[in-house]
C-alpha cells in the first residue's frame, strides 16, 4: 500500500507516519498543503490512500479532496480526512465531498488500523 500523507504540521506528519509504519506500511509520500499534495499525487501514482488534513495554507483539504474527486484518474484512491474538525456538519461535508472515512485528531494507532480495515 502506498500512502500520501498531507498535513501542514511537520510534527503531525511525523506522528502519523510513525503510526502508519507501525502497521507495516512504509511506502509513504508527504506533502504540506493541498497544492503540493496534488502535484505529488500526479507524480507518484499509483497512490492507494490519502490521509488528509482539513486546515492547511495554499489549498485546504476539502478543496484538495474535491479536486481529486473531479479527476477520474484518481477515482480508486481512498481518502481519509484526519483532522481536528469534529463538528458533525464538517464530517458530513467531507464525506459528501468524497472522503471515504474520517478520523478526528489525535487518534490512536488502533483507530487508524480500524479505518484502514487491516
Language-model regions, residue ranges each:
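Active-site beta3 strand of CheY-like receiver
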Residues: 45-51
Amino acid at each position: 500500500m502506498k500512502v500520501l500523507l498531507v498535513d501542514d504540521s511537520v510534527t503531525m506528519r511525523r506522528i502519523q507516519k510513525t503510526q502508519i509504519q507501525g502497521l507495516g506500511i512504509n511506502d509513504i509520500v508527504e506533502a504540506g498543503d493541498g497544492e503540493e499534495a496534488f502535484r505529488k499525487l500526479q507524480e507518484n501514482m499509483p497512490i492507494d490512500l490519502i490521509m488528509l488534513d482539513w486546515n492547511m495554507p495554499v489549498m485546504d483539504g476539502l478543496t484538495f479532496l474535491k479536486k481529486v474527486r473531479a479527476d477520474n484518474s484518481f477515482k480508486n484512491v481512498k481518502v481519509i480526512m484526519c483532522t481536528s474538525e469534529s463538528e458533525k456538519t464538517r464530517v458530513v461535508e467531507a464525506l459528501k465531498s468524497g472522503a471515504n472515512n474520517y478520523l478526528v485528531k489525535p487518534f490512536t494507532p488502533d483507530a487508524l488500523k480500524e479505518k484502514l480495515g487491516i
